[in-house]
Amino acid sequence: MAIIREHSTAQHSTAVDNEIVSFDKEKDNLIIKGNNLLALHALKNEFAGKVRQIYIDPPYNTGKDSFNYNDKFNHSSWLVFMKNRLEIAWELLSDDGTIWISIDGYESHYLKVLADGIFGAENFLDEVVWQRAYAPINLKKTFSKSHDYILVYAKNNSGAKELNRLPRKAEMVASYKNPDNDPRGVYKADNFSVGPAVEKNIYEITTPSGRKVLPPDGYSWRFSKERFEELLADNRVYFGKDGNSAPSYKRFLSEVKDGVVAQTLWTYQEVGHNQDAKKEIKSLFDGQAAFGTPKPEKLIQRILTLGSDENDLVLDFFMGSATTQAVAMKMNRRFIGIEQMDYISTVSVPRLQKVIEGEQGGISKDVNWQGGGSFVYAELFPKNMGYLQDVIHAKDLEELKSVYERMLSGTDTDEPADISFRADLSKIDWLQGFDENKRLLVKLLDKNGLYYNYSEIDDKNVRDLISDEDYTFNKNFYEGGD
């Protein structure tokens, strides 16, 4: 198990279970199982300023989200939960990076205020509205919600900051014509008049047919008379096939910036909806709804198109069903994914293995995905976390007593639990019942000891617990193999 410096550690193998003892930060993709806050701290020294784009889809704090986190905090607890993670994530972003956060209307306004404080209101780029549903739910008494939001911030929103552009659709290109066979190629004939009127740009134009033309009432020409003469001499003014129409300005496709600027309303026809996402998951897992709240691959494709380029590093620390990582692999981005829930081994990692094998769902056909790629899988090495999970999953008082005895003795786990210095063991009273004692046992555990610290890696009691391969992997990851 590879220990995360100053915080915790990780078991490792590739997605195909190959033994590895090294990690190339410039090439390898990384999946980490464990608490995402601790994992982010663990990554900070190695990846600060190196992540081009972050996308996260955190628990929405509604009580209805299928994230197996505590998805019904009060507002203040949820905001602290988010704040701790966003502050570290911000340090990982490169100077030209962006962070994209999916959220629903329930917490979007609170999150916006929090994010402004962390990232700087001046770095807020915009709020995207994604149409996640298209059919109304008639059981609703007021409104049937059909959209979520995506908040977008830049690490450095200078005046020169630009996002990438979206590819032009075929129908957009088809609207460019070349009726007069201009050697510069196809163009759009843009309106030559604009409003409100600018007095100096109101003048008479004579068409090739000899007709005298003035701009419509309340309007003036787009250009001054001097500029019009220059454009006319350069054959950039079009008067229609018969030379008798009002002037138009030729806007050549060859001179327009590649792609189009993204709008802030994303419809389901463009980027998919929730049901599309669920179908994508079902198609990968024999028709089973393996994950309740995935995002459609087309949505993530658009986000990565706008915020990153090939070979850039993309981070998602609420990895879920691994949609971000699957799309990143298909789009030739490097990625880091973090997930603490057990479905990482039944959904997330198997999904990425299917991507490597060349599965043809989601955006695969759009990008001509043929398979390939790899990733390194790591787990934070649990210390108190193992005991905590045992307490949480205990089904009765006898099972709880057994966990408590192991916490104190270390039987079957090689090491006893780290008990909080604030804990009062005398308060354990088995006559109080199951629920009360479960709560007390959770409080006993030192939350700073959920995972083994990298600083402990050479301690004999820790060194004896990890394999030589994991030891070497950690040394390579944090110290370049020293």
Walk through the language-model features, giving the residues of each.
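Accessory, often C-terminal, charged low-complexity segments
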Residues: M1-R5, F23, D28, K44-A48, ...
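Core domains of carbohydrate- and sulfate-ester-processing enzymes
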Residues: M1-D17
